[in-house]
Amino acid sequence: IFSKTKSFDPYLERSETLWLLHWMLASDPMLTTWYYIFNYHPSIIINKEKLTNELVSIGKFSKWKGMSANTIKRDVDCFARTYTFSNKKGEFTEDSIECPLAELGLISTTYTKGEYEIQKGPKLTLSDKIFEYALNDYWSKQTNQIITFEKLMYDYGSPGKVFQLDEKSMEQYLEKLEMDSKNFVFSKGAGGLRQITKVKEISENQLLKNCYKKVA
């Protein structure tokens, strides 16, 4: 994406790149704060102080090396700055590079200081090609050729969790994917069973190129 010789988006100007960065951050269990918030956090309301305490408790239980309350607090602060605009009006400014993923609309501020809200539902700038890339990446960690709709929606590290989609939005992405791509089949069976079948292997590099087809 940022290669000096052939770059799709060297100056971080395209929403595709922002969504890819979000996917890489929030689908990686090693990046605990990001992964926990988008996959495990029990509420759409995030309180920074409570979140810090939750992560400290998890760290103590899991015996994280080099963990301290201060390092986790800084991590939570970094997360908040990444996803929310620094100005009170929530507008994009020249200083918005400090909050590169704010324009994705995944996290919003509330009227309570230190509180944020996860925005679940349709994501207007999340393209079909980015969704397909994320789906394929998620699938690479699975062992089955068929995945249920529910697993794709609610499994930890899944596109449904990481992108905070609702079921209607997920269905729309899958239906569009089946129409435009020969790689996946979305089916609805008896009793309302919905599942996705991967019909062939796909090159990750090709999927990445597809995301930037207009400028590649």
What are these regions (language model features)?
Residues 1-216:
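Donor-sugar nucleotide-binding helix/loop cap in glycosyltransferases
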